[in-house]
Amino acid sequence: MRKLLIALIAFAFTSTSSYAGPKIEVLHWWTSGGEAAALKVLKDDFAANGGEWLDMPVTGGGGDAANVALKARIVAGDPPSASQIKGPTIQEYDQEGVVAPYNLSLIHI
């Protein structure tokens, strides 16, 4: 869970648009019952700390469909603020220069 959370947060600051408060659009595939309940914990924590979570769920494929959607958004120049990413895929995105630096001290782990 920790690695998945870190991957999710890795894109948290990639948006170049300015905003008044902490607001993130999160692309993810946690849509089934237990997954959605786990994600709700993250959403609620973010909201409790003054953030606004914009949900972008992508169903199906165990994350494969979400990865296709993420690639399309990046290519179009419109990446989400954060994305759930599997394992070493985050390294591939980093090598392409599309991962913004993040600060683990901002994450309550």
Show the residue positions of the predicted features.
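Sec-dependent N-terminal signal peptides
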Residues: 4-14
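Sec/Tat signal peptide C-region and signal peptidase I cleavage site
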Residues: 16-20
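Short, well-ordered beta-strand elements
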Residues: 22-31, 53-58, 81-82
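Short, polar/charged alpha-helical segment
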Residues: 33-54
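Pocket-flanking alpha-helical
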Residues: 36, 40, 61-101
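Conserved small/polar residues in nucleotide/adenosyl-binding loops
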Residues: 107-109
